[in-house]
Curated annotation (Swiss-Prot):
Family: Belongs to the DapB family.
Entry annotation: catalytic residues: 143, 147
The encoding gene: dapB
Single GO MF annotation: 4-hydroxy-tetrahydrodipicolinate reductase
Binding positions (NAD(+)): 8-13, 35, 86-88, 110-113
The protein's role, per its UniProt record: Catalyzes the conversion of 4-hydroxy-tetrahydrodipicolinate (HTPA) to tetrahydrodipicolinate.
Organism name: Clostridium perfringens (strain SM101 / Type A)
UniProt entry keywords in alphabetical sequence: Amino-acid biosynthesis, Cytoplasm, Diaminopimelate biosynthesis, Lysine biosynthesis, NAD, NADP, Oxidoreductase
Gene Ontology biological-process annotations: diaminopimelate biosynthetic process; lysine biosynthetic process via diaminopimelate
Subcellular location(s) of the protein: Cytoplasm
Name of the protein described by the UniProt record: 4-hydroxy-tetrahydrodipicolinate reductase
Gene Ontology terms: cellular component: cytosol
C-alpha cells in the first residue's frame, strides 16, 4: 500500500484525488492532508502546515499553489521522502530552487499530469523540427476564470519543448497587441480565461497552403488526478535524489 500525504487536500483537485484514490486505486491510501482549510470533510486527518503532520507516509503529493514550495521541500528533506509537485505558477527563482532541491531528494515535477498532454508534448519534439521552416507556430490555452497564473504551466511546457527541439533561436511572446508584422522566429502563447473551462491547449502550425493543429481538451479533472496517483505509485520506492517526470511514469521516449 502506497501511503500519501496530500497537500491542498481541500481544494478542487484535492477532492478529486481523494475520491479517485478511494474508488479507483486500491493500492494507494491518502493517510493525511495539508491545507489551510482543516475543516473539510475527509476520511483522513488534515493539518494546517507540513511541520504539524506526524503521520507516517511514502510520498508527499502537492496540488496547491507555488507559494507552498519551500515548506514542502523542507518537509521532504526532513522526512527523506519523495515529493511530487503538480502545482503551476512557479517563478524562475522557484524553478532554480526545484532544480537544486532535486540533488537532495527524489523530486517529481510536471506542469500537467494528464497522459494526453504528455503524449502531445513528446509528439511536438518530433513534429516541430520538421514543420518549423515552412510553418508559423502559435499556441492557444484556455482555462476557467478562477485560474490565477497565465500563461498556464502546460502552455509554457509545450512552448519550451518546441523551442528546445529547434536548432534555431526563437522568441516567446505572450499575446499580441499593436501594429507589427510577425517575425519568423516568434512563437506566441495566447491566453483565454472564462467560465468553467477545465483546460484546453492548441498548438497551431500555420503554413501558406495548410494548417496543422494539435489539440488537447480536458473534459474532467479526473485525468490530472489519475496521472498524479500513477506518479505516487511510481515514486513510492524511489530513494535516489533526482528529477522525475511523467515521461518516467509513462516510459515515453519517441
Amino acid at each position: 500500500m502506497v501511503k500519501v500525504i496530500l497537500n491542498g487536500c481541500s481544494g478542487k483537485m484535492g477532492s478529486v484525488v481523494s475520491n479517485l484514490a478511494e474508488t479507483k486505486f486500491p493500492n494507494v491510501e491518502i493517510v493525511a492532508g495539508i491545507d489551510n482549510n482543516t475543516m473539510a470533510q475527509r476520511s483522513y486527518p488534515i493539518f494546517a502546515k507540513p511541520e504539524d503532520c506526524n503521520v507516517s507516509y511514502d510520498v508527499l503529493l502537492d496540488f496547491s499553489r507555488a507559494d507552498a514550495l519551500k515548506s514542502l521541500v523542507e518537509f521532504s528533506k526532513k522526512t527523506k521522502k519523495p515529493l511530487i509537485l503538480c502545482s503551476t505558477g512557479y517563478t524562475a527563482e522557484d524553478l532554480k530552487f526545484i532544480e537544486e532541491s532535486s540533488k537532495e531528494i527524489p523530486l517529481f515535477r510536471s506542469a500537467n499530469m494528464s497522459i494526453g498532454i504528455n503524449l502531445v508534448n513528446n509528439l511536438l519534439k518530433k513534429v516541430a523540427p520538421v514543420l518549423y521552416e515552412n510553418f508559423d507556430i502559435e499556441l492557444v490555452e484556455r482555462h476557467h476564470n478562477q485560474k490565477v497564473d497565465a500563461p498556464s504551466g502546460t502552455a509554457l511546457l509545450l512552448a519550451h519543448t518546441i523551442q528546445d527541439s529547434l536548432n534555431e533561436e526563437t522568441k516567446l511572446l505572450y499575446g499580441r497587441e499593436g501594429i507589427a508584422k510577425r517575425e519568423k522566429n516568434e512563437i506566441c502563447v495566447n491566453t483565454v480565461r472564462g467560465g468553467g473551462i477545465i483546460g484546453d491547449h492548441e498548438v497551431i502550425f500555420a503554413g501558406d497552403g495548410e494548417v496543422i493543429e494539435i489539440n488537447h481538451k480536458a473534459i474532467s479533472r479526473d485525468v490530472f488526478a489519475i496521472g498524479a496517483l500513477k506518479a505516487c505509485e511510481y515514486m513510492a520506492d524511489k530513494t535516489k535524489a533526482g528529477k522525475y517526470s511523467m515521461d518516467d511514469v509513462l516510459q515515453l521516449n519517441f
